[in-house]
Design a protein with these regions (language model features):
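Structured binding/interaction patches within domain cores
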Residues: 1-153
Length: 153
Protein backbone atom coordinates (compact mmCIF):
# COMPACT_ATOMS: atom_id res chain seq x y z
CA UNK A 1 0.00 0.00 0.00
CA UNK A 2 1.24 3.52 -0.76
CA UNK A 3 1.99 6.00 2.02
CA UNK A 4 0.36 9.41 1.41
CA UNK A 5 3.27 11.29 3.01
CA UNK A 6 5.82 9.54 0.81
CA UNK A 7 3.80 10.31 -2.33
CA UNK A 8 3.36 13.95 -1.31
CA UNK A 9 7.08 14.31 -0.52
CA UNK A 10 8.05 12.88 -3.91
CA UNK A 11 5.66 15.24 -5.70
CA UNK A 12 6.90 18.24 -3.68
CA UNK A 13 10.55 17.49 -4.49
CA UNK A 14 9.77 17.22 -8.17
CA UNK A 15 7.79 20.48 -8.13
CA UNK A 16 10.69 22.38 -6.58
CA UNK A 17 12.88 21.24 -9.50
CA UNK A 18 10.32 21.85 -12.25
CA UNK A 19 8.70 25.25 -11.69
CA UNK A 20 5.37 23.87 -10.37
CA UNK A 21 4.03 22.82 -13.77
CA UNK A 22 0.20 22.67 -13.70
CA UNK A 23 -0.02 19.84 -16.24
CA UNK A 24 2.35 17.84 -14.09
CA UNK A 25 0.11 18.51 -11.08
CA UNK A 26 -2.96 17.22 -12.87
CA UNK A 27 -1.08 14.10 -13.97
CA UNK A 28 0.17 13.53 -10.42
CA UNK A 29 -3.36 14.01 -9.10
CA UNK A 30 -4.53 11.42 -11.63
CA UNK A 31 -1.78 8.98 -10.56
CA UNK A 32 -2.48 9.58 -6.89
CA UNK A 33 -6.23 8.99 -7.29
CA UNK A 34 -5.59 5.82 -9.27
CA UNK A 35 -3.30 4.39 -6.57
CA UNK A 36 -5.65 5.45 -3.77
CA UNK A 37 -8.64 3.92 -5.57
CA UNK A 38 -6.88 0.65 -6.31
CA UNK A 39 -5.60 0.25 -2.73
CA UNK A 40 -8.85 0.88 -0.86
CA UNK A 41 -12.36 -0.50 -0.75
CA UNK A 42 -15.61 1.45 -0.80
CA UNK A 43 -16.30 0.42 2.80
CA UNK A 44 -12.81 1.50 3.88
CA UNK A 45 -13.30 4.92 2.26
CA UNK A 46 -16.73 5.33 3.86
CA UNK A 47 -15.15 4.69 7.29
CA UNK A 48 -12.42 7.27 6.61
CA UNK A 49 -15.04 9.85 5.64
CA UNK A 50 -16.82 9.34 8.96
CA UNK A 51 -13.67 9.25 11.08
CA UNK A 52 -11.98 12.34 9.63
CA UNK A 53 -14.87 14.69 9.13
CA UNK A 54 -16.02 17.87 10.82
CA UNK A 55 -19.03 18.17 8.51
CA UNK A 56 -20.75 14.92 9.37
CA UNK A 57 -24.26 16.04 8.40
CA UNK A 58 -23.31 16.91 4.82
CA UNK A 59 -21.11 13.83 4.42
CA UNK A 60 -23.75 11.54 5.88
CA UNK A 61 -26.31 13.08 3.56
CA UNK A 62 -24.03 12.39 0.57
CA UNK A 63 -23.31 8.79 1.63
CA UNK A 64 -26.99 8.10 2.26
CA UNK A 65 -27.93 9.65 -1.09
CA UNK A 66 -25.40 7.35 -2.76
CA UNK A 67 -26.94 4.28 -1.15
CA UNK A 68 -30.50 5.48 -1.80
CA UNK A 69 -29.76 6.11 -5.48
CA UNK A 70 -28.73 2.49 -5.95
CA UNK A 71 -31.85 1.34 -4.12
CA UNK A 72 -33.90 3.48 -6.56
CA UNK A 73 -35.15 5.66 -3.70
CA UNK A 74 -33.89 8.97 -5.11
CA UNK A 75 -33.07 10.43 -8.52
CA UNK A 76 -29.61 10.87 -10.01
CA UNK A 77 -30.09 14.65 -9.77
CA UNK A 78 -30.63 14.36 -6.00
CA UNK A 79 -27.46 12.29 -5.68
CA UNK A 80 -25.49 14.83 -7.72
CA UNK A 81 -26.84 17.67 -5.57
CA UNK A 82 -25.65 15.95 -2.38
CA UNK A 83 -22.30 15.15 -3.99
CA UNK A 84 -21.76 18.78 -4.99
CA UNK A 85 -22.59 19.93 -1.45
CA UNK A 86 -19.98 17.54 -0.08
CA UNK A 87 -17.36 18.55 -2.66
CA UNK A 88 -17.88 22.23 -1.82
CA UNK A 89 -16.66 21.54 1.72
CA UNK A 90 -13.11 21.37 0.37
CA UNK A 91 -10.46 23.57 1.94
CA UNK A 92 -6.72 23.42 1.44
CA UNK A 93 -5.76 22.44 5.00
CA UNK A 94 -4.05 19.07 5.34
CA UNK A 95 -7.03 17.56 7.14
CA UNK A 96 -9.49 19.10 4.68
CA UNK A 97 -7.54 17.86 1.69
CA UNK A 98 -7.40 14.28 2.95
CA UNK A 99 -11.14 14.39 3.64
CA UNK A 100 -11.68 15.75 0.12
CA UNK A 101 -9.58 12.95 -1.40
CA UNK A 102 -11.72 10.39 0.41
CA UNK A 103 -14.86 12.02 -1.00
CA UNK A 104 -13.36 11.94 -4.49
CA UNK A 105 -12.47 8.26 -4.18
CA UNK A 106 -15.94 7.42 -2.86
CA UNK A 107 -17.35 9.31 -5.84
CA UNK A 108 -15.26 7.14 -8.15
CA UNK A 109 -17.14 4.11 -6.86
CA UNK A 110 -20.40 5.99 -7.53
CA UNK A 111 -19.31 6.95 -11.04
CA UNK A 112 -18.36 3.37 -11.72
CA UNK A 113 -21.83 2.22 -10.63
CA UNK A 114 -23.48 5.01 -12.62
CA UNK A 115 -21.53 3.74 -15.62
CA UNK A 116 -20.35 7.26 -16.37
CA UNK A 117 -17.10 5.85 -17.69
CA UNK A 118 -17.83 4.71 -21.24
CA UNK A 119 -18.24 1.03 -21.88
CA UNK A 120 -14.78 -0.40 -22.26
CA UNK A 121 -13.29 2.62 -20.48
CA UNK A 122 -10.70 2.20 -17.79
CA UNK A 123 -9.81 3.86 -14.52
CA UNK A 124 -7.98 6.67 -16.35
CA UNK A 125 -11.24 7.57 -18.12
CA UNK A 126 -13.05 7.55 -14.79
CA UNK A 127 -10.45 9.83 -13.19
CA UNK A 128 -10.54 12.20 -16.18
CA UNK A 129 -14.29 12.59 -15.78
CA UNK A 130 -13.91 13.30 -12.07
CA UNK A 131 -11.15 15.87 -12.63
CA UNK A 132 -13.34 17.69 -15.18
CA UNK A 133 -16.31 17.66 -12.79
CA UNK A 134 -14.13 18.85 -9.91
CA UNK A 135 -12.78 21.67 -12.04
CA UNK A 136 -16.34 22.84 -12.70
CA UNK A 137 -16.96 23.10 -8.94
CA UNK A 138 -13.44 24.16 -7.91
CA UNK A 139 -11.78 26.02 -10.82
CA UNK A 140 -8.82 26.74 -8.55
CA UNK A 141 -8.27 23.08 -7.67
CA UNK A 142 -4.83 22.85 -9.35
CA UNK A 143 -3.64 25.91 -7.39
CA UNK A 144 -5.04 24.57 -4.12
CA UNK A 145 -3.51 21.18 -4.80
CA UNK A 146 -0.16 22.87 -5.46
CA UNK A 147 -0.44 24.87 -2.22
CA UNK A 148 -1.17 21.68 -0.31
CA UNK A 149 1.89 19.98 -1.78
CA UNK A 150 4.08 22.96 -0.90
CA UNK A 151 2.73 22.96 2.70
CA UNK A 152 3.67 19.28 2.97
CA UNK A 153 7.24 19.86 1.74
Amino acid sequence: MYDINEIMNNISEFLEKNQKNKIFLINKLRDFLKKFYENNSQINIKEKIFLNNKNTDISLSFLLASENYYNSSISLNSLISKRVQAWKLFDSSSEGFRFFLNLIIYTMYDYEKEEIAKEGGDIDDLISIIIIDLHDIHPSLPTQFEEFLIQQA
